[in-house]
Amino acid sequence: LEVVSGGKAIYRVVYREGGTAAELEAARAVAKTLGRICSAEVTLASDILMPGQEYPAEGYDILVGYTGYPESRRAYEELSYGSYSVSADGGRIVLAARGDNEISRTTDEFLSLLTVTGKGDECRVVFPSDAVRRGTLSDEAAALPMISGGEYDSVYSTGDGAYMVVVKKADADISTAYLAALAEAGFEERIRHTDEKNVFCSFEGKGLTVYTAFCDKTLRVIVQKGSLSDIMFPDRAPAAGSTEPLVSFVGLAYDTKNNGSLYKNGLSLIWRLSDGSFMIADGGGQNATHAKLVYDELCRLAPDKNNIRISAWFITHAHIDHAGVFHMFTQSYRDRVKLDRLICNIPTNAYLQGLTDDSTESSAVAMSDTIHSDIRKWQGLEVIKAHPGHKYYIAGAEIAVYTTADMLYPALEATTANSTSVVFGVTVDGKKLLVTGDAGADACGAAVAVWGRALKSDAMTVIHHGLRGATTQFYSFVNPETVLWPSALVLFEDTRSRSYNAYLLNS
């Protein structure tokens, strides 16, 4: 197939309108590379159709991703999750992949198959019509049975070895059928949490864990290596003890000039559990002062300050004022305490780098790298990737996960890393404290759509220190009696009149 002839591009590159960021990036890469080869512009077009239009039966097109063209759909029917193919179908060239990493691979495979001769007006580029390249990059995703029905979106690499299949326009029948398909494929259902409109299940099998979430007319299936944590099972979790449980909202050393050494904001929560162990949410910024505040509070509250055990440390998101203290604490205090578990859901660096509406995202990538480096310094540390619908049980405390970055796919729907915050509720002695991190308006909307009245809490941390991101709608569903405001007084005074903050203060 003659892609370039006489120095002019014969073929155009077509991507899926409304497709994934990875698909668009791959299409752009193909068009840009071909343009560089032939020193001419290559047309890049979406597959969108106007009312009454149909795709032409023939054309000189390089189809990238899950386009609406029949040739693309035929190629995808042959692919398992986590796989890719490059081939010709008639006169069209098809780059197909069930995965964001996989679609990137198709561009390399396609370009490697091209034969280029001549330069300038003599340039000729040929793709062999009988060529077929296939492969699988994720054996974990490939182990999943295919979902029948709904509107397939993509397979996403969501960080820490997890892969997520997203199918939109799903219904209860599609979800039920897929749960049966997982069982038939050799996965054993171990946990199911349901309410009037949502179904969350956890499976084990083949050395993998599979989480399914049917909510808001979308079916998400997440697979990763490993087994389910003991704290997901009430009868296997740490038992309650006789120590009086409490929660401490730790004051941080705030710098009103915000000069980078300390902060106007941050979040540090410590629960003492009934077995004498602790849970921590975030902890504060990347400085020795905040790390010492956390350690000193643990010592003050511990039944035995020489035997401090942290049952779980939650990191809401990879921003330095929340997660930075984990690095400093690891550096200074890991030999003085026992840390059993780290619970978080940090997207891939590629995802974080794709967030364009926040000048801090380069630091989010650095913070993520630092966290993962620090994880390796703790002996025997269990790392749990939190997913919506997860419940954990630790010494009389019940933790429910409401939103994570998982809820913001397809595509890069989050505008900042703030919206990737893990939002979770901790219930002790019948009282629930909702931890919101820096969740943005998009995450708030997803939480309300899925959870509604289940968000009701006795207390909550105000979103993003009172800065942008919160919505009055979200706060109306939480409807707390007590609000914890993790910010310096000067920031509180500057933001208290904002509509969502005024709602909390006046309701």
Question: What would you call each of these model-derived segments?
Answer:
Residues L1-R12, S129-K168, I222-I231:
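Compositionally biased P/S/T/G-rich terminal and signal peptide-adjacent segments
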Residues V14, D61-V64, I93-A96, I270-R272, ...:
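Structural recognition of the beta-strand scaffold that forms the well-ordered cores
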Residues A21-I37, K169-I191:
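Amphipathic alpha-helical segments
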Residues D230-I308, K385-K456:
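Core dinuclear metal-dependent hydrolase active-site scaffold
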Residues G276, A288-P347, V450-L467, N479-L484:
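Active-site metal-binding motif and surrounding structural segment of the metallo-beta-lactamase
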